[in-house]
Amino acid sequence: MKFASCSAIASCFAGALFLTATTSKADDWTIESNADWSKNIKSAKGAEISKGSVAPTGKTATVVTRIHSSDRKRSADSLVVTQSAIWQNWSPIQNIGPSNLGDAPVMLTVGPNNYWMFGRYKGRQPRRKKGQKQKPLPPFQPKSAKLDGFDMPLQTTPYPNQFNAPGGLKKGKGGYHAWQSRDMKNWVHHGPVTEGFSKWVTSAEWVDGKAYIYYDFPNDQDPHVYVDENLFDGVPGKNMGIAVKDPSHGSDAGFIRDLKGNMHVIIEDWSPINASKRSWDSPLAGHAVSPNGLNGFVFKKPPVDKRTKPTGKTATYKHPHWAKEDPKRFKTNIAEYKVHEPEQEAFGDWAAICIGGQYYLFGDYDPIGGHQMSVGWFTSPSIDEEFTWCDRIGKGHPDPDVAFAQGQFYLATQQPTDYVSPGPWVETVEVRVGVDTDKDNLIDEWTEWSEVKEKYDYIKGFSKQISRSPAKLDLSKLPAGFGFQIQMRLTDSTENKSKPIVEKLSLSFKE
């Protein structure tokens, strides 16, 4: 539903320019559905209403509501603006993290100015011109160094913006290593955190001052976990063994702890697809929850289910690692799956984050037809409900992870390009509210125009649970009245594909 001009809207409503109040909680005035928007809008310019939201069709839009009236005089408290949860506000940046971090990056935010990344440690590789033999690099001579925020001895490395702490000087064990940063620019290497058999690290979480580092063993099978109380010592933590007994094949799991302390895992489920032909991803994801993150995971309903129709046939595929890496538990590399038609989209390598109760799942997206892979993401107001598709970004097999750091969100991939976002909120939204003080259906006084936006912050003790402060206009200084009107200006201020999509306006009144 598009609105071309103020006059067009006026003719559509052809009559009264005010509404009698409909009650909700404390008689709040809420606009959040297509019917609400159509009923409450007096005029709009450059705006489109679709699926219960309003957004600019071009660079700018202006929306004016009808006067919301009541028989009794009331005092307004605040106006809250809620945007779509689609979260398209991502911009490309060069790879974050250490330049020699290899394989799929795993991120862990411990708190403000305390950010960690895990990955394989890639050695220096000399450049070789075509037709010439590779020449060895000259030995690097480290020097003592100092870096703000680190009170330990440091040494320079041949890699830019990277330093070795004492733990980083210890010999690797064939698995993942740990790097720490205070600013997401300079990185301190603290050495190995997993071993050769545990090299398939998929996710990390922070629990009561300890790092839980999850890995598949063998590859694409049951998640196992280390509990590491000291990420600085260059020694892997305590290997707790298998954490999740995966009833399917697939793993590449992402873990997230909820605010009650329960650990959730989102896992690939290869039962409906030949994953070997779809980048080892699947249209189906599993979800399980545990009270401690170490064991006792109970499976729930799937958070992502994009299966097509089962044919009733069963077929097989082969995995290259299972019997080789864990011959005691896996006697064969052959697995069965249920054939589905038509062709299915595939997702995987899951990573999760929650912002003010809104959950997001990021992962691989392998579309139908063998087109370019990318990062795809889903969202849900509850981790126990099915997630809704949002969008995709980038090129190549991403194996992504997502984290909150330095007041913004980082999306890391194993491709040359990563992404950064200020959050799901998209600028710019300006609002003002007017009041009819004498019941003549005319506005007598307006607030000043004010920009509103959401704000995000850390929650102490949680890595992937982020607090959200609403986009709110304080109306406490507005005089009491019988009618209220909202004016809103929307400006697409970003250089990416996002734009401000307003899903809800809620004007609350004092009791």
Question: Across the structure, where does each feature detected by a protein language model lie?
Answer:
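Bacterial N-terminal signal peptides
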Residues: A8-T20
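Sec/Tat signal peptide C-region and signal peptidase I cleavage site
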Residues: T20-A26
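Beta-strand-rich ligand- or partner-binding modules
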Residues: A26-I96, A405-G407, T413-E511
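Hydrophobic core segments of beta-strands in well-ordered, beta-rich domains
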Residues: S78-Q83, D103-P126, P142-G168, H190-E195, ...
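Blade-edge beta-strand/turn elements of extracellular beta-propeller
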Residues: N89-I96, M184-E195, L231-D246, N292-P342, ...
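Surface-exposed intrinsically disordered loops and tails
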Residues: R124, R128-K173, K306-P342, L361, ...
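Beta-propeller blade signature
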Residues: G175-D183, H224-L231, S282-G293, S374-I383, ...
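Loop/turn-rich, solvent-exposed surfaces of beta-rich toroidal or solenoidal domains
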Residues: F330-T379, A412-W425
